[in-house]
Amino acid sequence: MATTHLDVCAVVPAAGFGRRMQTECPKQYLSIGNQTILEHSVHALLAHPRVTRVVIAISPGDSRFAQLPLANHPQITVVDGGDERADSVLAGLKAAGDVQWVLVHDAARPCLHQDDLARLLALSETSRTGGILAAPVRDTMKRAEPGKNAIAHTVDRNGLWHALTPQFFPRELLHDCLTRALNEGATITDEASALEYCGFHPQLVEGRADNIKVTRPEDLALAEFYLTRTIHQENT
């Protein structure tokens, strides 16, 4: 079926292991309820009608994905990821087809809310460079002394935001910025940082702070609580 200007492809880099989870199983394959974290993350994307396809970049040696129902989903494409996140995203972009806009979403961020996703997708009507979901920093921030666990000073949190995902950009722009940044040896921690490196200024779309990334063991219980609460609210 031909794509339209409204169609969006989502890219989910899922080739990482996540050693901070202190488990032999990659964190995206840990279960919350009757689904893996990866399944929760992908289904949240597919719940929006504009997201017509999801490309998942997995490790070439991954044997777990084929055991999931996602492996046979008609809207899912699987590609081999790379050593770094940016390599996996580029592999996903190459498989995204001719869509104008792409989302990039963390495999281990299962608590995405549909209202946040809808507001982010609306950027395609008002922005040429896209933007990201983000949450204003509310905690007091400290900078440490170099090489020490000692406070150097308090950082002014005004204007500081936590970068979340999804992140949403024109496909060709993101591809070109990632390629240039990697070729020039830039440090790329998320997709927005590639655009920043190339002189662009993506928009900040305020999202819910409970859109957490499961990184440490204690995050798993918190994500389960948030997902259970959301399901309960939807059913009442």
Swiss-Prot record:
Q: What protein name is recorded for this chain?
A: 2-C-methyl-D-erythritol 4-phosphate cytidylyltransferase
Q: Which domain of life is it from?
A: Bacteria
Name the catalysed reactions: 2-C-methyl-D-erythritol 4-phosphate + CTP + H(+) = 4-CDP-2-C-methyl-D-erythritol + diphosphate
Task: Give the molecular function GO annotations.
Answer: 2-C-methyl-D-erythritol 4-phosphate cytidylyltransferase activity
Q: Where is this site: Transition state stabilizer?
A: R20, K27
Pathway in which the depicted protein is active? Isoprenoid biosynthesis; isopentenyl diphosphate biosynthesis via DXP pathway; isopentenyl diphosphate from 1-deoxy-D-xylulose 5-phosphate: step 2/6
Q: Tell me the subunit arrangement.
A: Homodimer.
